[in-house]
Amino acid sequence: MEVYLSEFINWKLYEFKKINELGTSTFRYYFKGKIVNLKNKRVSSNEVCYMFKLMDDTGIVELNYSLSKYSPKFEMLRQLQLGISVFVYSDVVCRVSGIRAWKLQIHSKNLESKIEATISEPEQIPCPGFGSDNIVPLSLVNDFKDGAFVNVLVAIQWKEEFEIFNNETKKSLPKQTIHVHDISGSAMIVLIGESQVKSALSWNNETILLIHNAIAYRTNTGMLELSIKDAIIQTLQSFDGKVLKLLNFSIKRKELIKINAYRLSTLEALEKIASQSGEAFGQVGVLIMQSKIKDLTKEGGLVYGNDLTGLRFADLISIIVDETGSVKNPKFSQKLLEEITNIAPTELSVLNEEQAMHLENVFLYRHYRVCVGFLNKQIYVFSSDEPLKSYI
């Protein structure tokens, strides 16, 4: 995350995942993030609360900003849109409840609390008329109200068989459901009518779709559904070089999206599989939230020289999380820990407490794509290019 100082030299800049670890306190801080979700509600006849989800390279933070409709800042907030980058300045932070439920709360009455847009409007990209700033992960689309228009980039996982659908006029129409994924979640696209079904005949599990103005709904079972009735759709084959360059998507990145859509799992899904079959393995995007490096440094337990201390190195990470839950005390492979910390266990023996704290700052609150194994009531974490049984 970029560091901005200039006239705000006395303000602290926090990456989002560090903000999410702060307790209830009062201090000055500021950060920059991209708006990926935006709602508002009337609190009283004269007060409105804007509810944001802001994203940077380290994660997502939620923010509630309350202000009077007579405030000079009110008109600026009305003009904010998805994709705009904003600065947030505040001297107040408040934890509501739980690691996944709390939000930053600021009010325009706090003179040191404000939101400023860094650009007047989101970047607009020609052909098809929107940019990567406006592409929303499916995990965030779940927070949108039913009927919201969204832009998504998804890979097809599978297509269901054709059905016959009877509409309100009892006219029989062809219907097909297509399941799609991105690296954060899943959804389904329901095609109704001959023209929609025909348009998707060439789609298969190699197809990636860039969809502009899909309409998001929740089904009775809670599944996310995307209506493409009024959408603009580009398939992988129709991306030309100019659009790819403007959207900042390389061929390699498209391949990663496709691979992630098929293979990326969640901690919750693996836990459910393990509860039924006794074991489960998959690739998961996780965030390292807590380590034992502070405690082990004080105990002198970072010295590496025998099996016991080697095991303690494997126990270095206390908590990992993804969007579905958390895991305590996972066993990390030595190879993966060396990749993450960029230090060998033998080098840990010469670190003092201050150096150990600095090392912790290198890997905490960072996203990693790792392999996770649930086996014999233990959770193992390892890199994708090493066999699990090499260290269990």
From Swiss-Prot:
State one molecular function term (GO): single-stranded DNA 3'-5' DNA exonuclease activity
Intracellular or extracellular location(s):
Cytoplasm; Nucleus
Sorted alphabetically, the Gene Ontology cellular component annotations on this record are: chromosome; cytosol; nucleus
Query: Does the UniProt entry include the keyword Nucleus?
Result: yes
Gene Ontology biological process:
reciprocal meiotic recombination
Q: What does this protein do?
A: Has a role in meiosis.
The protein in question is named Meiotically up-regulated gene 11 protein
Organism of provenance: Schizosaccharomyces pombe (strain 972 / ATCC 24843) (Fission yeast)
Taxonomic lineage of the native organism: Eukaryota, Fungi, Dikarya, Ascomycota, Taphrinomycotina
Q: Which gene encodes it?
A: mug11
